């Protein structure tokens, strides 16, 4: 007696069972849309951060001026691709006019894909120049097998790029070194060179004829890795020359990554220290006249004290992790 009623109840509920997959599919679509929206939001945030940091560096150090012709050195790696990409997009909103010319030095390394950069740059519709110079053969002839060739290769490359800049009429040479490169160089000089010396954001070249700028000076390498993946740059491997890796620099890179992971704020403080130097509390008499220092008998509220407050408390560290806010005159970012 109850069986038909039970059957009828199941039949009545059957349409609901058939609609369940449709409801589930709709939910999956909504979840997919939410993921896409979140991903798009994060991507936009990443670009805005890169644009803000590059614009800040340009403004802080007056890297690019009205009428400049900026020679962007493009190696085919993630850093130089990102530098070119961000500079091109900033130029659209910059309050000044400047030109960009992309330059690649083809050093005739075995396996170098010569077609990649010309094809990529042609699509961007910007002026570019490929300089063909067989420095690879020179380096292989002069450096013993198994030794790193980076130092000699870098010197040869630098001289060629300086010459090309003059031939193209470039007023600035832009290199793709980022914040991590600067910190690695600082530690290398400190640990192995006995010098407090980093990598300047702007410098006059040793030939006195060129100004070199590093627009990525404030940018973290991890952000450049994410941006390169997002933009799907056609990356060219950097180990085609077969040189032994620079093990000391790799060691510094690993050290910085480990500190950043284990001790939040430490790497930020290290970087901030590069722009907060107190020569009177170091020991370089070329920077501060220790020999002629005398007591004046007058108090100076801004003068030195014999014993500084310990800078390693939690409050002190947290207060130093962020750079002070500064006005960026180079470009407005609100509409990016």
From Swiss-Prot:
Keywords, alphabetical: 4Fe-4S, ATP-binding, Cytoplasm, Iron, Iron-sulfur, Magnesium, Metal-binding, Nucleotide-binding, RNA-binding, Transferase, tRNA processing, tRNA-binding
Tagged with keyword Transferase: yes
Cofactor(s) it depends on: Mg(2+); [4Fe-4S] cluster
Location relative to the cell: Cytoplasm
Subcellular location, principal: cytoplasm
SUPFAM superfamilies: Adenine nucleotide alpha hydrolases-like
CDD domains: TtcA-like
Entry GO MF terms: 4 iron, 4 sulfur cluster binding; ATP binding; magnesium ion binding; sulfurtransferase activity; tRNA binding
Record-level GO BP terms: tRNA thio-modification
Gene Ontology CC: cytoplasm
Motif placement: PP-loop motif: 75-80
Biochemical pathway: tRNA modification
Chain residues that bind [4Fe-4S] cluster: 150, 153, 241
Keyword Iron-sulfur on entry: yes
Cofactor note (record): Binds 1 [4Fe-4S] cluster per subunit. The cluster is chelated by three Cys residues, the fourth Fe has a free coordination site that may bind a sulfur atom transferred from the persulfide of IscS.
Annotated segments matching region Disordered: 1-42, 301-328
Catalytic function, reaction form: cytidine(32) in tRNA + S-sulfanyl-L-cysteinyl-[cysteine desulfurase] + AH2 + ATP = 2-thiocytidine(32) in tRNA + L-cysteinyl-[cysteine desulfurase] + A + AMP + diphosphate + H(+)
Pfam families registered for this protein in UniProt: ATP_bind_3 (PF01171)
Ranges of biased composition (kind: Polar residues): 315-328
Family annotation (InterPro entries): Rossmann-like_a/b/a_fold, TilS/TtcA_N, tRNA_Cyd_32_2_STrfase
Family to which the UniProt record says this protein belongs: Belongs to the TtcA family.
Function: Catalyzes the ATP-dependent 2-thiolation of cytidine in position 32 of tRNA, to form 2-thiocytidine (s(2)C32). The sulfur atoms are provided by the cysteine/cysteine desulfurase (IscS) system.
NCBIfam families per record: PRK10696.1 (NF007972)
Self-association state and partner proteins as the record states: Homodimer.
Protein name: tRNA-cytidine(32) 2-sulfurtransferase
Species: Paraburkholderia phymatum (strain DSM 17167 / CIP 108236 / LMG 21445 / STM815) (Burkholderia phymatum)
Gene transcribed to yield this protein: ttcA
């Amino acid at each position: 007696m109850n069986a038909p009623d039970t059957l009828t109840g199941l039949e009545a509920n059957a349409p609901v069972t058939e609609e369940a997959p449709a409801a589930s599919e709709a939910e999956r679509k909504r979840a997919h849309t939410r993921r896409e929206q979140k991903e798009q939001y994060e991507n936009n945030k990443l670009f805005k951060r890169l644009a803000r940091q590059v614009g800040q560096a340009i403004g802080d150090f007056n890297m690019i001026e009205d009428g400049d012709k900026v020679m962007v050195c493009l190696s085919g790696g993630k850093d130089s691709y990102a530098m070119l990409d961000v500079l091109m997009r900033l130029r659209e909103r910059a309050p000044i006019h400047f030109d960009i010319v992309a330059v690649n030095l083809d050093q005739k390394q075995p396996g170098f894909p010569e077609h990649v950069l010309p094809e990529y740059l042609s699509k961007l519709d910007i002026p570019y120049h490929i300089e063909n110079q067989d420095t690879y053969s020179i380096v292989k002839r002069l450096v013993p097998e198994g030794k790193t060739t980076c130092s000699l290769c870098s010197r040869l490359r630098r001289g060629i790029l300086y010459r090309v800049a003059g031939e193209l009429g470039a007023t600035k040479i832009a290199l793709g070194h980022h914040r991590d490169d600067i910190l690695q160089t600082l530690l290398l000089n400190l640990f192995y060179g006995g010098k407090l010396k980093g990598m300047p954001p702007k410098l006059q070249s040793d030939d006195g004829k060129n100004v070199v700028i590093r627009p990525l000076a404030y940018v973290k390498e991890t952000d450049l890795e994410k941006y390169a993946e997002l933009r799907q740059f056609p990356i060219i491997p950097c180990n085609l020359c077969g040189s032994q890796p620079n093990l000391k620099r790799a060691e510094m890179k690993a050290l910085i990554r480990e500190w950043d992971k284990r001790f939040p704020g430490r790497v930020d403080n290290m970087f901030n220290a590069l722009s907060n130097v107190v020569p009177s509390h170091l020991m370089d008499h070329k920077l501060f006249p220790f020999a002629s220092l005398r007591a004046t008998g007058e108090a100076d509220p801004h003068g030195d004290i014999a014993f500084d407050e310990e800078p390693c408390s939690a409050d002190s560290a947290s207060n130093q992790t962020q750079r002070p806010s500064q006005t960026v005159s180079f470009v407005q970012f609100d509409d990016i």
